[in-house]
Amino acid sequence: MFEYAERLARWADALRSDTEWTSELESSFDAIGFDESYLSTLKEARRKYNRIKAIKDHIWGMIEIEPSDAWLLDSPLFQRMRHIRQTGLTYLTYPNAHHTRFEHSLGVYFVVKRLLATFRRTKEAFNIAAQHRTYLDIRFTPVAYERHSRQERLLLHAALLHDIGHAVFSHVSERLFAANSDRLRIGKKSIQQFRRSFQEKYDLVDSDIQTGRGKPLAELLTVGIITSSRFARFYRLLPGQPDTDPLPDLCDISTLVLGDRIEPNDFALPELLSGPVDADKIDYMIRDAHKPEHVN
């Protein structure tokens, strides 16, 4: 693992040792159907994930979902986002603004796939070395879905999972949490302490928080979910996933969600998901503006 993922692994270990966090998280998993009973059905269910699915999106048209990605999409964790509105409480004023994190995450996945396909077609241009350092060091592979490189596969999974830590009213909830960060608790810790524990393990300093390098709470919760023991057991059953400890992959996915590199020279890869002009922004700007009553 590269340095960012190693730092996340330290934080994940600390979270797993917090019995209250683990208990509350697993209770939340149980409440949405991501429980032991669901996990017990997955070995048999894997046989169904042997071909591409297609979902029609009103923004991007037909989105093809590859088997291992459909496995994530069909999980109760991802399906929960059908009930989380993208724009919080805006729909109360603009009735057409009722789109959800579910369709947004699908859109981000689609845009990332398009960007990767473009990179693949123009790989020679993007692999030109500048000052003896390769700008984009992605091991490109044929277009066939089963041959995606590890980096591409993890980026696509990060695209699907990047918003699973959002609370019920999206960013509105975050403002509520921020205003009560010393009183509301996550496991044994207040939200303030939870953020501080990440800051310490991820080697951020106070100035990082003040200058905006501090990670949003929704992203920290996403990382906590992805690196949890139960999610690791679920991910280990992923079609095509080797039967080994998935924590290195999950830490790399989490690193991409946070906008950091998973390889020393992968400067461009994380920016496809979290950069000045990234797949996340491309989708939500188009999707939010598409609703005629929700135009600023």
Each language-model region and where it sits:
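Sequence-structural signature of the catalytic-core scaffold of metal-dependent phosphohydrolases
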Residues: 2-85, 89-157, 165-296
